A protein has these predicted regions:
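TM-loop-TM module centered on a large, flexible mid-protein loop between adjacent transmembrane helices
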Residues: 90-92, 97, 129-133, 203-206, ...
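Membrane-interface "cap" regions at the ends of multi-pass membrane proteins
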Residues: 1-47, 51-56, 69-73, 85, ...
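Hydrophobic alpha-helical segments and their helix-loop junctions in multi-pass secondary transporters
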Residues: 170-203, 267-273, 387-404, 461-465
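Extracellular loop-to-transmembrane helix junctions
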Residues: 21, 44-141, 254-263, 443-452
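Membrane-interface loop-to-helix entry segments
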Residues: 124, 138-197, 251-255, 376-389, ...
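C-terminal membrane-solvent junction of multi-pass transporters and transport-like membrane proteins
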Residues: 166-167, 336-347, 387-438, 468
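A generic transmembrane alpha-helix motif of multi-pass inner-membrane proteins
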Residues: 374, 378-386, 415-486
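Helix-loop-helix connectors at the membrane interface of multi-pass transporters/channels
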Residues: 2, 6-15, 90-93, 99, ...
Length: 486
């Protein structure tokens, strides 16, 4: 394997990049960006949010999409300057120090570890929709799903990229088909179940803002978390060919996808049917296609929703494996997570995440009625913390630029540093609005517990972190020479 196919190692901040293959092409990066920004938040969550808040949901997606885009642009600037599979953890280490890297990494791991728990259980629930699988225990299906995606991740980064490419392609094709059929139904005022499609459904069901302000704020929190995964493109940059060229294209096109797919789809849902016709128990796509009489619509949408869950699971194992390795090499995570297999895959970190995923099956067996609420609240905490740390890291980077210690790449976050502060304020307001509901207050309480555990964890590992940082960089210089000589 040539030197050009491997990630160079020069400093401790680069140590976690040693040994990876740069096998992800432009189409993989583009689809990973799509897979991260379009997922179960649209295919599953949009129905329930529409039923609660009405057409204003489209505006919520638009506003939250802008701030998610700003966060990704901040990450993109850092990634173009120095692509790293450690992504925001590596950048936090460079600009905030080891303490910042520790907090960022464990927030991100918390997010995706509990999301994996939710995803494998979701796959099992979706499979039970069909009669032929109803006799199979839920834990068996969950285990098979986890094993399948685990194997894909262990094979190679190219196998992961190919799987995510096709998962994302199915989601995009489904949305495009829906949008075409929905526009036709609205223009022709075609019957959709007991209703008639058309813009009149907005006025006849209470206008654009039928819900109260507290409800809208509660929905906004859910919408922000629906964009969780957009940061995945930063992790993939470390294993991309020509990252400096293809990463800006992937990130810039993300804002178009957000507005076109999310805002466009939700607006069409509101025109096609009164918002009261939707439900949190059913995908809005299924509601629409069933209403216009498309044969086997529910079966088709069940396959798509299943694909969305597998896509999320696939991305979760990929990202957490690499993040844990970056942390393990400097003493911030378990040593086992630092190991690579012969395919240059961080199998240690992937095994740890997959093992925690099995706890999701146990959780659903013990508290099936509230399991998803528990894990998604924890995931929300991880997303909020990760995004905030990305923006704070970018601010620290800008301070070094101002002092003349480094330079900004051509691909820059627009309006920085003011947009950093604006985005941080927005996320703080949205998270703080949790006090309006009992579930939200419980989430904030969990956030406090996580912060306490992180503080305690840092004091537990900080002595060995400093010693291992320099050792990791030095030892990996030798490893890089061996890998490049394969």
């Amino acid at each position: 394997m040539s030197d050009n196919d491997q990630t160079p190692v020069s400093t401790a901040t680069d140590a976690g990049d040693a040994g990876y293959n740069k096998a992800l092409k432009n189409r993989h990066i583009q689809m990973i960006a799509i897979g991260g920004s379009i997922g179960t938040g649209l295919f599953l969550g949009a129905g329930g949010r529409l039923a609660q808040g009405g057409p204003v949901l489209a505006l919520s997606y638009a506003v939250c999409g802008v701030f998610a885009f700003l966060m990704v642009r901040a990450l993109g600037e850092l990634a173009v300057r120095r692509p790293s599979s450690g992504a925001f953890v590596s950048y936090a280490r460079e600009f905030l120090g080891e303490k910042g890297a520790f907090v960022t990494g464990w927030f991100f791991f918390l997010d995706w570890a509990v999301t994996v728990m939710a995803d494998i259980t979701a796959v099992a629930v979706y499979m039970h929709y069909w009669n032929m699988f109803q006799g199979v225990p839920q834990w068996v299906i969950a285990l098979i799903a986890l094993a399948l995606v685990f194997v894909l991740n262990m094979l190679s980064v190219k196998a992961f990229g190919e799987a995510e490419f096709w998962f994302a392609l199915i989601k995009v094709a489904t949305i495009l088909i829906f949008m075409g059929v929905a526009i036709w139904a609205i223009l022709t005022q075609a019957p959709v179940g007991e209703y008639t499609a058309g813009v009149h459904n907005i006025a006849e069901s209470g206008g654009w803002f039928p819900a109260s302000l507290p409800v809208v704020f509660a929905l906004t929190l859910g919408v922000v978390f629906a964009f969780g995964g957009t940061e995945m493109v930063g992790v993939a940059a470390g294993e991309a060919k020509n990252a400096a060229t293809i990463l800006p294209k992937a990130i810039n096109s993300m804002v178009i996808r957000i507005f076109f797919f999310y805002v466009g789809s939700v607006t069409l849902f509101a025109f096609a049917l009164p918002y009261t016709a939707y439900s949190g128990d059913e995908s809005p796509f299924t509601t629409f296609f069933s209403g216009i009489g498309v044969p086997h619509a529910a079966d088709i949408m069940q396959v798509v929703v299943l694909t969305a869950a597998l896509s999320s699971l696939n991305a979760g194992l990929y990202a957490t494996g690499r993040t844990l390795r970056s942390m393990a090499l400097v003493g911030e995570g378990p040593r086992f997570a630092s190991r690579l297999n012969k395919n240059h895959v961080p199998y240690g970190g992937i095994i740890i995440t997959a093992s925690l995923g099995l706890l999701g099956v146990l959780l659903n067996a013990l508290v099936p009625s509230s399991a998803f609420e528990i894990v998604m609240s924890l995931a929300g905490i991880g997303i909020a913390g990760t995004w905030a740390m990305i923006l704070i890291t970018h601010l620290a980077f800008l301070r070094k630029v101002k002092r003349g210690e480094t330079q900004r790449p051509q691909f820059r976050m627009p309006g920085a540093p003011y947009t950093n502060y604006l985005a941080l304020l927005f996320f703080a307001v949205v998270v703080s609005s949790n006090v309006m509901t009992f579930e939200g207050r419980a989430t904030l309480a969990l956030f406090g517990v996580v912060v306490v555990l992180m503080v305690a964890g840092w004091y537990f590992v900080r002595r060995r972190v400093g010693n291992l940082t320099d050792e990791a960089a030095a030892s990996l210089q030798g490893d890089e020479t061996l890998v490049s000589g394969d």
